[in-house]
Every structure is written in structure tokens, then in C-alpha cells.
Swiss-Prot record:
Alphabetical keyword list: Ribonucleoprotein, Ribosomal protein, RNA-binding, rRNA-binding
GO biological process entries: translation
Full protein name: Large ribosomal subunit protein uL23
Taxonomic placement: Bacteria, Pseudomonadati, Pseudomonadota, Gammaproteobacteria, Lysobacterales
Record carries keyword ATP-binding: no
Superkingdom of this protein's organism: Bacteria
Protein function: One of the early assembly proteins it binds 23S rRNA. One of the proteins that surrounds the polypeptide exit tunnel on the outside of the ribosome. Forms the main docking site for trigger factor binding to the ribosome.
């Protein structure tokens, strides 16, 4: 697996919401949806390499999938993993930029 494939297998998507926007402004923290197998070290390396920034800290949260019903049948959404990435002061990432 090449380094680009490794990066994109670790980082799935940025999470954009009012809460994440507030975190960006107040504490220079960005939130990403990451692979379930990704470690903090993997996330840190991927963000530093992809966005060319210096990461100060990474916190990871496992989010449990919700129970939902569809046409009177019970089902579950999948579990997923969320990473809070704090950057060194003075650096930023444009997560809204289009590829």
C-alpha cells in the first residue's frame, strides 16, 4: 500500500457541524471520521502528511451506531470512530476546500 492509500484509508472525512466550527475557532481543534482500526499515531501521521501542519494532540472516540427501524424491521447503523486533532498554535486546515 502506498503512502497516499494509507492516508486516505485512515482519514475518511472531516466532520463539519456547529460544534466542530466552534472547536476550530476556540481551541484550534479539527474533527475527522477515521477508520475503525486507526490509532492515534496513524491519525497524527496522516494529518501532518496530508495537510502539511504540525499536530499537537489527538483524541479518539468510538461512536456507537444508533438503532433504527425501516418498514417495521429493526436495524442498526454501523459503529464509527471520530478523531479530535489539535494543531499547534498559528496553524490551520481548510476542511471546506473542494478537491
Amino acid at each position: 500500500m502506498s503512502s497516499n492509500e494509507k492516508i486516505f484509508s485512515v482519514l475518511r472525512a472531516p466532520r463539519v457541524s456547529e460544534k466542530t466550527a466552534r472547536l476550530q475557532e476556540i481551541s484550534n481543534q479539527y474533527v475527522f471520521e477515521v477508520s475503525n482500526e486507526a490509532t492515534k499515531a496513524d491519525v497524527k501521521a496522516a494529518v501532518e502528511q496530508l495537510f502539511d501542519v504540525k499536530v499537537k494532540a489527538v483524541n479518539v472516540v468510538n461512536v456507537k451506531g444508533k438503532s433504527k427501524s425501516f418498514r417495521n424491521r429493526a436495524g442498526n447503523r454501523g459503529n464509527w470512530r471520530k478523531a479530535y486533532v489539535r494543531l499547534v498554535d498559528g496553524q490551520s486546515i481548510d476542511v471546506t476546500a473542494k478537491a
